[in-house]
Amino acid sequence: MNNSEQLIALKESETAFLKYFNKADYELVDFSVVEKLDWKQLNHEDLQQMGERNFWQHEHQIYALRNDFTDQLLRYYSMYPTAATKVAYTGLIIRNNEAAVQVGLENYAPSLANVQQSLKLFIQFIQQQLRDNVHFVVLGHYQLLDALLDKSLQTPDILSMIEERNLSGLFTYLSTEHPIVQILKENTQQQLNVLEHYIPNDHPALVELKIWERWLRTQGYKDIHLDITAQPPRSYYTGLFIQCHFAENESRVLTGGYYKGSIEGFGLGLTL
């Protein structure tokens, strides 16, 4: 496929996504790739992200190129509330001077049924339009770390070792018998079963993970992995996250996650 054909295919995929979810009664939204920011309203995490963003000042006003749709929509709807409970978008994101096209959905005040229906529709779109299918699924939950590791041990060094799955380092800092070490020693397909030995059965994170695992299996997905190593990209990501990896295009990953800041939601996104 030459450059012209790739460009046409990309634009057709964007248009098809909007048509597909418009037909499914999602509200379509179109926001400028240039965000107008107020320094007084930016928090510590916003400022940390400026390292990967392109931004500039003009007449005492700060502007930045969009680097995250969920973050942009959350910021906008916090100031201008919407009655929409589910929205669909397409457009550019720019991170570290690299531009990419992303398509995605946001469910606001989400119910489990609505989020799972959104995921089903998203995967159906990928099957029909992109001619691809889910190869395996990764589940995780951002409350697991607090359930498995005392706050006093959540130092930058230890968190980095967990994220890198550095077992030799964790042996030294935590001990070979620590729950995190014991879980990481297992195959990721078995870790959800092992997790049950280290946190109470009624822990909200474990309950939610088991609900999702059962539902995914009813949808025909058998290759399900647990990730206890991921750190939330923003503090408002406080719940379950999911990654759907595909069979044909291994570089594409459908990602989703629950968040609760000034707005509660569950987002799903795919970079084309």
Residue ranges, per PLM feature:
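TRNA-recognition modules of translation machinery and tRNA-sensing kinases, especially anticodon-binding
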Residues: 1-272
